[in-house]
Amino acid sequence: MPTINQLIAQPRKAQKARNKVPALNACPQKRGVCTRVYTTTPKKPNSALRKVAKVRLTNGFEVIGYIPGEGHNLQEHSVVMIRGGRVKDLPGVRYHILRGVLDTQGVKNRKQRRSKYGAKRPK
């Protein structure tokens, strides 16, 4: 433990919180191009084939984004919009791809929580 004189000479440094979404550069969303669309398996104890895409952003970052909802139309060279938000059981996936924006279509036959999946209001 430092003495009072040591603290006067060199005060304590405040700890900086690390940025959880560094690729966004303090923007709410970023645009990017899919370089690879594939499925991956989650950590234990979960089991599934989660749909993800590797995206090269306009600022040069290459990130992995999760594709939410059932079914998607993404392929290589699709232009997508990305937001922050990790997927807890997929290590390295710290971003979500927005549905219903740019080349990504909304989820078909979605009745509830439509705005989260870019689905239009059913007639």
From Swiss-Prot:
CDD domains per the UniProt record, alphabetical: Ribosomal_S12 (cd03368)
Q: From which domain of life does this come? A: Bacteria
Disulfide pattern:
none
Q: Name one GO cellular component term.
A: small ribosomal subunit
Alphabetically, the GO molecular function entries are:
rRNA binding; structural constituent of ribosome; tRNA binding
Q: Which UniProt keywords apply?
A: Methylation, Ribonucleoprotein, Ribosomal protein, RNA-binding, rRNA-binding, tRNA-binding
Q: Name one GO biological process term.
A: translation
Q: tRNA-binding: is it a keyword of this entry?
A: yes
Where in this protein does the record say 3-methylthioaspartic acid is found? D89
Assembly behavior: Part of the 30S ribosomal subunit. Contacts proteins S8 and S17. May interact with IF1 in the 30S initiation complex.
Its annotated function is as follows: With S4 and S5 plays an important role in translational accuracy. Interacts with and stabilizes bases of the 16S rRNA that are involved in tRNA selection in the A site and with the mRNA backbone. Located at the interface of the 30S and 50S subunits, it traverses the body of the 30S subunit contacting proteins on the other side and probably holding the rRNA structure together. The combined cluster of proteins S8, S12 and S17 appears to hold together the shoulder and platform of the 30S subunit.
- Give the record's family classification: Belongs to the universal ribosomal protein uS12 family.
Q: What is this protein called?
A: Small ribosomal subunit protein uS12
